[in-house]
Amino acid sequence: MASKSQILFIGGTGYIGKFIVEASAKAGYPTYVLVREASLSDPAKSKVIENFKALGVNFVLGDLYDHESLVKAIKQVDVVISTVGHGQLADQGKIIAAIKEAGNVKRFFPSEFGNDVDRSHAVEPAKSAFETKAKIRRAVEAEGIPYTYVSSNFFAGYFLPTLNQPGASSAPRDKVVILGDGNPKAIFNKEDDIGTYTIRAVDDPRTLNKVLYIRPPANTISFNELVSLWEKKIGKTLERIYVPEEQLLKNIQEAAVPLNVILSISHAVFVKGDHTNFEIEPSFGVEATALYPDVKYTTVDEYLNQFV
């Protein structure tokens, strides 16, 4: 087996980043996280930083907005994984420029980890965020940088604890709001599993210049099926309140940030079916559970047990 690629994370202490960094370290990859000096002493990040230290993660001092520090950090590694948040998506052009100058990167994973932005029917404000991600894809391709785009669909930890009920702090016990007719299938993946699959793809020639879709069959489920599964677990039938698409579109326009973003992404997935309304063609994509059948992923059924 060839030696494992060295991986640099940019945005590694963020929401999804920390899971992928952990998966990288646990799989024995030499793992580097770009951090600003201030982040190392930030109380809000102390738990994540301590966990990284315990896992043997290396910290590289630098900044997305300091070109020289970025180039220097990238020159030390083989693979760059960006997990920057919503507000920094457009700034990934700076990573592309640094990768280009460094000239040694075997693979770049831009910050994706959601819907496939090239196959989207999203309305605003999600539309603009997806367009920003798509522009980054085009820039990566135009520069001839080897890539993998990870389309991991929904984070289980974000949507399942409340069954996607806006403003709720726990899963519903009496009534549940369902967007649209509840029939399009969506996909929910546990964040740790997203980390595992992403890291498996790093040195895999089958994922080179492809979209890696994470579509576990057991986690591909319509909203109606999700509610039925939850009802079975709590031994209770919920009142289902369906919100027609027309009403949902109006709600999106009237909502403030961040609710309008959440609702517009929910509309794309639960009404338009953007997780599952296309076939994965070998010309552009591969599917994670097919490539890595040995990975035991957490199913939606298992995941919901903790909330009963």
UniProtKB/Swiss-Prot annotation:
Q: Which GO terms describe its biological process?
A: lignan biosynthetic process
According to its UniProt entry, the function of this protein is described as: Oxidoreductase involved in lignan biosynthesis. Catalyzes the NADPH-dependent reduction of phenylcoumaran benzylic ethers. Converts dehydrodiconiferyl alcohol (DDC) to isodihydrodehydrodiconiferyl alcohol (IDDDC).
SUPFAM superfamilies for this protein: NAD(P)-binding Rossmann-fold domains
Pfam families (UniProt xref): NmrA
A Gene Ontology molecular function term of the record: phenylcoumaran benzylic ether reductase activity
Give the Enzyme Commission number.
1.23.1.-
Give residues annotated as binding NADP(+): G11, G12, T13, G14, Y15, I16, G17, R36, K45, R137
Family membership noted in the UniProt record:
Belongs to the NmrA-type oxidoreductase family. Isoflavone reductase subfamily.
What reaction gets catalysed by this protein?
A: (-)-dehydrodiconiferyl alcohol + NADPH + H(+) = (S)-isodihydrodehydrodiconiferyl alcohol + NADP(+); (+)-dehydrodiconiferyl alcohol + NADPH + H(+) = (R)-isodihydrodehydrodiconiferyl alcohol + NADP(+)
- InterPro entries reported for this sequence: NAD(P)-bd_dom_sf (IPR036291), NmrA-like (IPR008030), NmrA-type/Isoflavone_red_sf (IPR050608), PCBER-like (IPR045312)
What protein name is recorded for this chain?
Answer: Phenylcoumaran benzylic ether reductase Pyrc5
Keywords, sorted A to Z:
Allergen, NADP, Oxidoreductase
Question: What residues sit in the active site?
Answer: K133 (proton acceptor)
